Regions:
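Short, small-residue-biased leader/transition segments that mark boundaries at the very start
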Residues: 1-6
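Metalloprotease/metallohydrolase-associated module, dominated by Zn2+-dependent proteases
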Residues: 14-19, 23-26, 73, 80-163
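Short pre-active-site segment immediately N-terminal to the catalytic Zn-binding motif
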Residues: 25-48
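Divalent metal-coordination and catalytic microenvironments
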Residues: 33, 54, 120
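Activation segment
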Residues: 39, 56-57, 124
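Active-site recognition of the HExxH zinc-binding catalytic motif
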Residues: 46-58
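Membrane-interfacial alpha-helical segments at the cytosolic side of multi-pass membrane proteins
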Residues: 59-75
Length: 163
């Protein structure tokens, strides 16, 4: 199991190469600031940018959950222990998004039709997308109506950006 850390002035992502996570047909999986990559998979600039978009989406959800629980604690006296729910919140919201897409046709593209994946697919070719975060804060919400942003099969996605 190899590990490396990518740092720039805007974000930090710990990359873990292993054979267990991600599972199935996926080549990479982002969980907050950890990027799990299958052994033997080349980490291209486009794939790294795609996963950085997912990292930003998840950190936005964590921030909102933390701010919401702090506000609820200060305003209504709700227990501060609810702040612990902010950590698994992105995974639960991702799962809910995919579950909603499973209920809507076409069923075979549920993950690709989720608003989170649609935002990442449409913007993975732009190396500056994650650096201009203030312009794209909660941009995944605009990708919820998937008729405006249809699913792009892998063979029709934009070519890889230059490294």
């Amino acid at each position: 199991q190899r590990q490396m850390c990518i740092r720039d002035s805007r974000n930090m992502m710990k990359i873990v190469y292993n054979r267990f996570i991600p599972f199935g047909r996926f080549t990479a999986l982002t969980v907050l600031v950890w990027l799990f990559v299958k052994e033997g998979v080349a980490l291209t600039a486009r794939l790294l940018n795609h996963e950085k978009i997912h990292m930003r989406q998840q950190l936005e959800i964590v921030a909102v959950c933390l701010l919401g629980t702090v506000a609820a604690h200060l305003l209504f006296g709700v227990s501060a222990w609810w702040m612990l729910a902010a950590v698994p919140a992105p995974l639960l919201i991702y799962g809910l998004s995919v579950a909603i897409e499973v209920l809507l046709p076409p069923y075979n593209r549920a993950y690709g039709n989720s608003c989170f994946e649609t935002e990442a697919i449409y913007n993975q070719h732009d190396p500056l997308y994650t650096r201009r975060w203030w312009r794209h804060l909660f941009a995944w919400i605009t990708y919820i109506p998937n008729r405006k942003y249809p699913y792009i099969p892998p063979e029709k996605r934009p070519p890889m950006m230059k490294n």
